Amino acid sequence: MVVCVLSGKVCYLSYNVTRVSDDQAAHVAATFETVAKCIADAPHRLIQEVEVLSQLDVDRLKTWNAYQPIAVETCYQDLFRQRCDLHPDSPAVVAWDGSFTYDELDHFSSLLATRLQAAGIGPDVFVTICATRCRWIPVAMLGIIKARGAFCALDLSHPLDRLKDICDALKSTITITTPTDSNIARKLASTVIVIGGDAPVESDRITPMNDRPKPTNGHPRNALYSVFTSGSSGKPKGVVVEHRSFVSSALASIQPLDIRPHDRLLHFSAYAFDISVFEVLTPLISGATIAIPSEKRRKESLTHAVQELGATWALLTPTVARLYDPDEFPSLRTLALGGELAQTSDIALWQSKNVVIIYNPAECCPIGVSGPACPADGRFLGRSHTCQRAWIVDPRDHDKLLPIGAVGELLIEGPVVARCYAHDPNFSSPDSPFIQSTPSWMLRLRSNTSSGTRLYRTGDLARYGSDASLYYMGRKDSQIKIRGQRTEPGEIESNLHSILSKDKLGVAIVVLELRGSSKIIAFVSKDTGGLGGDSNTVGQLRIEAATEETDMCIIKATSKLHRIMPAYMVPSAFLSVNYIPISRSGKIDRTRLKSFALSLPQETLLRVNNGLETGDLPESNEEHRLQRMYSLVLGISRDKIGMESDFFRLGGDSLQAMKLLALAPKEGLTDISYEDIFRYPRLKDLARKASQSVTIKKDGFGENSSVIHPFSLVIDGQSLIDMAAKQCNIERDSIEDIYPCTPMQASIMSLAVKGKIVSFLTFGLALRDHVDTKRVKDTWHAAYRANSLLRTRIIVCAETGQLYQVVVGGDIFWDDDECGNFAQPESGPSASIGGPLVRMKLVEGQLSIAIHRALYDNWSIRQLLNDISGAYNGLPLPSRPSFNCYVSYAAKSLEAASSFWSAELGDADLDAAKYPEPVSQNSHTNSRAWLGIRVVTCQKESIDVLASEFRLAWAMITYARTNKKDVVFGVLSSGRSNASKDTKEIMGPIATVTPLRVTIDGTQDVGGALEELQYRQEEQAMYTHLGLRRIGQLGRNAAAACQIQTVLIVEPDLPDLRGVWFSNDATLPNHSDADASNYRLTIKCVVGPDCTDIFAIFDHQSLPIMEVKEILSQFEHILGQIHGKEASQLSVASIDTANFKDWDTLHKSTEMPSVCRNGLLLSDPTFLPHDQMKTFPAIEEAAAHCVFQDSLQEASIARDAKMQPKEPLSSADLISEINRYDLAXXRSRPSPESILLSELALTGESHSSGTHTVFVTGASGFIGTQILRHCLEDPRIDHVIALVRGSSANEARSRTEESARRAQWWSDCHSQKLEVWPGDLAMPHLGLNETHWRRLADRTTINAIIHNGASVHWLKRYADLEATNVGATAQLLQLAVANPRLGFVYVSSGRYTDPNAEAEEPAAANVAATAMPYSQTKFVAESPIRRTAARLPHGQTQVRIISLGLVIGDPLTGVVNADDYLWRLIATCVQAGEYNSSAGSEWMPISDVTSTALAIVQTALNPAGVPATIKPITGGLMWSEIWDLVTDMGYDMEPRPESEWMATVRRDLKREQEKHPLWTLSHLVESRSQLNTDAGAGSAWADAWRGDEATTRNLRTAFRRSLRFLGEVGFLPGQKGRNTDGEVNGRAFRRAW
């Protein structure tokens, strides 16, 4: 109360001290005095001109904001680099999918930066990140930053159209993604860079100079990132934040937010939220660690994620924080609350933690205001950090400061203020929140204020506290917060207007708080005239009865909004009202609308347009529990919730789904997942899913039974202990437990003991150079002790034949044999009862592992290595249920499982499983063949959806081929897809094959058939443990159903596992592949992001290859209909089952291969089908000869001794040879993720700059020595390694230098740069010693390989030349495939056609027709290289082929290889005195050796500069030109018709025999095509070979000099005739025949 004493001109302020502080009272009094004086001095001034700021306020503000905010003028990457230098080995990232140290993160981000710089990324160029939460997010952000670009992380939960709008707004054409999200990324950008997956930390480091991106001009005012917020115009706004802004904010936040160097900051926030940037980038400049949970853990089990990652610091919105109990976060020290206003109850809930309140709008960096949470006032925000200053101004006029304590608009000053909105045309307008000019009051209060200071009007209403702290008081506009996300109602309204305007519907948006959750309510009205009226003058607001027309409009609007806006911005309900009220100011009267909505029952809000259906009332316990949970979370009466009630149509959203999950354990429903709620939103469906888990628990497997007491699963424990001690040869005290084997294990042991399967499957892991081997062993020991399955052995009871598992103590079994390597399949341990089932060896950096098939399935072995990788990095080994829990569950549920399978198969047709038709046991062989196709698929909600489509497609094939509607085939069940959480976490062989019965009902629609299949499979998943053998014992029909001939396997395309401690891709043993030999036909579908590889694995002795090809073609055809967009309109009967690809076949070959020898048969190594009209049945037979010896350490090539191709080779033989070598190369290829990591080290210039070491073969030959010369003389190449045949290094070097001197270029100055390795191309590992081979294969020593070496011999057989010419090429190609950043150039020979347009099969026919083994070896060697290049992804084209014609000497020296065919032919004609005039108009490709060698080296250094896989060396001459050049040299020759010339050649050959120049090629004389005398043959050379006129002139000069050289050395006769002895002195190159 203010008391004025007019006589004394004194005013007294009376106040309640319990509500107003003395400081507040003083400021009120000072303000009153200032206002009163102002009015008294000028009573006629306008109200807005009255001064309200007192001197007390001015003095206090001067004190608080005396200094300008501190700006850090530094780029982010410089601060990060400092941290890397200080603590390179400290953990930078700990994530669900792996971890990185600071050094490793620096390394990988630098590789990515180099790649981005090559793509043109630089300052202020934006790159988007399209990836779900994983450890590669920091790599992507840092890589972009180091390239001097700016990033924007996309929230993939948002609609694709909104993501496209963001990319368009940023003008971003490049996105970085992971394999999981690459399909989405390709829809957003023209250039996609894929990183991540299971790719490892690369230990093989490149040179430090190459490890960092090239320096470019970076500046602190360059853009760092952009984050998008809601915009009132209908489009999101992109805030552009600069380096100096974020760095200033982050460094100033570290101390106030209590971030310590050893903290682990939880990366929780969505990428649409600017806090997500803070969570990633701030830890990396403070020395802390980013803790990244999986998206699944983040939504479903945040408590477990925090515990597993050891997070100590987290930032959550209050809405999320109140879902959890703080006691469930023991590792958490600090909790920051932000994004929305915290309630005092939130602060009280988390008072056991250090709770910090944070604030800042996205336009001012993530955080700039913070303070310890105030339990008494949830509006408390904290104080400004040193990077910014806070001012309170008049909401209507920012040029007017308000008194301390007054509520006004919060204005932020400092470097933290963003540059602007991306491409904002209104940036400089007065309405822009970014203030362009410094306010006068700031200059008055602070004399040193710079003119360039940045200010931002937040739109938030706030007030000062007495200590400069800030209190949030609301918004001055209609902007709202939904789940912490800023939302402009205007954006929603704008989009709704554009959708509904054609329907003449008005729209308005309000937000209601309903039971602690913000809901957007949309009002629509047909009476758009109401918008123009005054709400005070129109009638009562009321809900209009819904019409079909309005409902359709709303449904359409909702659908469109979901495509263009995030789900949280789509209205929860639409209310159709009689009109939209407006206020006196002409704006929508939202206050009245809000009051009207709040007056309605909540059920009414949800029922009006949602068509709420309740259905039957719940009956089961699970149904009643879910009804109660729905009611509690959604605030709806239970009697309004029935079996048909849909969680989301009742008003639920993603946040309330998390609340539902948090409530589930209290209701005893612990096995419902976040995805389950979205997948089964109807109460009845979610209850059914929950009941499956409950059934499992009742049967003895769940949380209450996760611990089984030792020996409790056997009856006579003591006698079994004695038996086990004897069979295992161990002490009784070392036996920890004994329990029965599962039916699956018993079956595996039975087959293993009988020798029908390989019992132990083995693999090897090469340790990284920096890895501590003791630490690796210690980690394995810890895993061995923690995982009882690894310590399990198997014994057999002699009396009953029962198999038991014995868990023993002790340490892991290490094989101490230093010589043998048991990790090879052929030398693996035999199946032994009582022996160790896991064996390991660690020798010379190689960890070899052998594990029995009875102990694992595919999931288990991958998870084991993931767990060990985490433990190696310091994470605790996960606690998993023991396998005896599963054994107990399987034993207790035998009755229920038997009942299920009896009911399922009791009336099955006795012939339902007989496709393909069974064969007798005697005729069954173990000869496996493979065929493969690739089909385009789009992975839908989950792989289960696709699996149902595959199963229906296969059922339709069986029906079409047997005409039986009752179909049974086998399916491989993981045992985990629909299991409880405990089952999913168990290590052990849970996966098994069970029969699936499908009844074809033609009247059923495809959608219904798929839904039924999926339901059947989910129900069946609970009982797969019974096993095929026991199911078959349930009756005659069940036994017949278990005689399955076909098994269908559907599994994801998982990348090769790679770890932080081992360097090579681990091709893990695959259980499903191993089981394929037990069935006549296995169809394996490997599902990728946008395609599926479908393999048929079959017994080719009894199932013809052509029939399997037809089956695959038919499968593709049927699947295309079921998977297609029109499938929902199809009935099962309308599916076309005809194999349409046969319709266009003019005739079908009846010739079938008589044998398919123990091989791997692929239709094509790229998994694409051959032409359906192929008419080469012999090719099928020849291709079946492919045998591939699989070694997990190195893809090798082996041939059955009985499989040597007959000579001369046919075209089918050549194709078979190509397939064999190509398969070896294909298996050497690493995973797509590791390909990417290698690619990151490459740029378009990386092969033309920097340090290079080049490896050259054939360096002592005619062409090879010139290649060596250009390598040694090229300044870009620092080191050259030449492989030369020789018994010692000295001999090899001597041969190399001798060749160089013969070519007239050697100088001793070349010695320092040259290293010569003795070897032999015909030998394994090229005949190199172990050290040299390791250097060649280590991925770091060699940057490029030039493979020129070959054995050139016209008389030897193919088999004699194969090892040198083909085998060596295959070995080098495997190295190149395994290391995609290795440049590989193969020097090949030319054929008539354009080499890049040449088709393989016609070429094979042509090459076979020549009957020349040398040419055939070159063709076979070249073809796998061509196929490999075709398989490589875009940008991975480091493999090139140089295709040569005839090579002559250079223009200066003319030194040639005198044994080349061209010179022998010319010598023959000179000697005869005549030449073939019939070939004069024909053209031959010819090049000089210098130009040729130079082109080869240039290609090796810069393969990207050669756009096609094959580079032909252009240039050539007409034969008439050649003869003119020869005669111009003084050689007298007469032109003769072909027949006369041939007669002369035959006569001379007969007379001179071995002294004749063509004697060694006499078998080719009759082949006119080889002598180029076939009319028209020469003209068949494609234009790709022909050079320009300058090339031709240079070529003529080189040709003359070569002829002169041959005359000088005596190969061609001189002026007095040719040397009679035919000897050529040592100046020319020769071949040994």
UniProtKB/Swiss-Prot annotation:
Cited function: D-lysergyl-peptide-synthetase subunit 3; part of the gene cluster that mediates the biosynthesis of fungal ergot alkaloid. DmaW catalyzes the first step of ergot alkaloid biosynthesis by condensing dimethylallyl diphosphate (DMAP) and tryptophan to form 4-dimethylallyl-L-tryptophan. The second step is catalyzed by the methyltransferase easF that methylates 4-dimethylallyl-L-tryptophan in the presence of S-adenosyl-L-methionine, resulting in the formation of 4-dimethylallyl-L-abrine.
SUPFAM superfamilies: Acetyl-CoA synthetase-like, ACP-like, CoA-dependent acyltransferases, NAD(P)-binding Rossmann-fold domains
GO cellular component assignments: cytoplasm
UniProt region (Condensation (C) domain), positions on chain: 836-1127
Functional pathway: Alkaloid biosynthesis; ergot alkaloid biosynthesis
Stretches the record annotates as Adenylation (A) domain: 80-483
Homology family: Belongs to the NRP synthetase family.
Protein name: D-lysergyl-peptide-synthetase subunit 3
SS bond partners: none
Domain free text: NRP synthetases are composed of discrete domains (adenylation (A), thiolation (T) or peptidyl carrier protein (PCP) and condensation (C) domains) which when grouped together are referred to as a single module. Each module is responsible for the recognition (via the A domain) and incorporation of a single amino acid into the growing peptide product. Thus, an NRP synthetase is generally composed of one or more modules and can terminate in a thioesterase domain (TE) or reductase domain (R) that releases the newly synthesized peptide from the enzyme.
Enzyme nomenclature, EC number: 2.3.1.-
Region (Reductase (R) domain): 1256-1483
Pfam family, one: NAD_binding_4
Single GO molecular function: transferase activity
Signal peptide residues on this chain, from the entry's feature table: none
GO biological-process terms attached to the record: amino acid activation for nonribosomal peptide biosynthetic process; indole alkaloid biosynthetic process
InterPro entries: ACP-like_sf, AMP-bd_C_sf, AMP-dep_synth/lig_dom, ANL_N_sf, CAT-like_dom_sf, Condensatn, Far_NAD-bd, NAD(P)-bd_dom_sf
Modified residues (O-(pantetheine 4'-phosphoryl)serine): S654
All copies of domain Carrier, residue ranges: 622-691
Keywords carried by this UniProt record: Ligase, Phosphopantetheine, Phosphoprotein, Transferase
Enzyme class: transferase
